């Protein structure tokens, strides 16, 4: 029977509930338990797929094609377990499900209300499909007191009574700010946050208290007294230098032991943390440093590239080097010469994106990398712009462009109108909805033998996650290959280009998919490990 850990947040947002949930999952896994992580998001969007990256951050795509919250990326990276569409739900999805049921007549004429219909829908989501797991860690988005989160708080309160006794606990993540004028940490914000949580009928079993310095024992006892939790259940969550330090830091503070004790699991199995210790050691003792330029269009919010950032660091772990990121807004190159920005970097990465803004700057970045023999990694839109650059400057197709930007005489990149998903044919048109209509999730690709990318993977059959609406036009394949750009990977039916590369370049690879979504600190993605390795070689030439 699964046990449930509900993680809530208080005082302020962005305290790191996702990291806390992921770290706890990793710690329980290290003790031999089977763990599942789920996220409840209070916003009214059906999913984050159509939300601005500068508001929401990255959209994390699962193997089964769900567009989800970026916290699911943390869950996957810390536990190694691939998430699914059933691991993330929003208020919008819940209400959509309920309205669909009401229209079908499933409620038999009943008045549909928040209680019980909305709360029941939430409870069903939380509890379904958990027979194969020992623990289900469920993160509730937002902050206690948010009006959007009220149905979720009520649902998890009810679950505390619905589930068998001793199978559900509540962990409250809160903040203990330091006031310089007073020279001390303050407990009052946490007290008020817990008071508000208790007013909703939820009594936390464990307090996970964020702070930027050691919490004195007297303050811990004070929190224990006023918040009605055991002294040992007041766990300090101090700031750390790297997120991959968090599992061991929380273990040293006793979080996983306290969770198991709250469930009455004593004595608990010993944790095996050797792999995490090795990762932390590589982070602390790098043998070198490389600089990677990320030429993007959402650089104002780094969370828009969360998985990408982590995957680059994983590549650094694999090569025992520190990866320094140089963020460049691609529009800058449309006004200024890119040379001063790029001549000292060891690698250039152009990530995914949407729309015409900044596209010419990305094309210029690809041209610089090709002509100067700088390692180049183009992902999704970054591959498309590299192909447009080749079409213009190598194949002589001056008007080469993408139909995403408007009508063009040379549609080197165009809207995908159909593709095979499983055994079915998916179709799209320019007049279709935006939400959930891209080529989403894991698709297989066939790599050409004796290419660099096949050598990197060590196989010619791969499966990677996609999120795109436009694709390189296969009709231009022969003309581009005559100019030296090799289409080194295609969809199994040979219709959709998946990867391109220049054989005579030190490292120039474009991929239509998003390999960053499958990279793990304990298992770096081979493309990122190889890209950083190429950057290390480049650093020796500069």
Swiss-Prot record:
Its EC number is 6.3.4.2. GO terms for cellular component: cytosol. It is an enzyme of class 6 (ligase). Mg(2+) binds at residues 71, 139. Pathway: Pyrimidine metabolism; CTP biosynthesis via de novo pathway; CTP from UDP: step 2/2. InterPro entries: Class_I_gatase-like, CTP_synthase, CTP_synthase_N, GATASE, GATase1_CTP_Synthase, P-loop_NTPase. L-glutamine binds at residues 353, 381-384, 404, 469. Homotetramer. Belongs to the CTP synthase family. This is CTP synthase. It comes from Agrobacterium fabrum (strain C58 / ATCC 33970) (Agrobacterium tumefaciens (strain C58)).
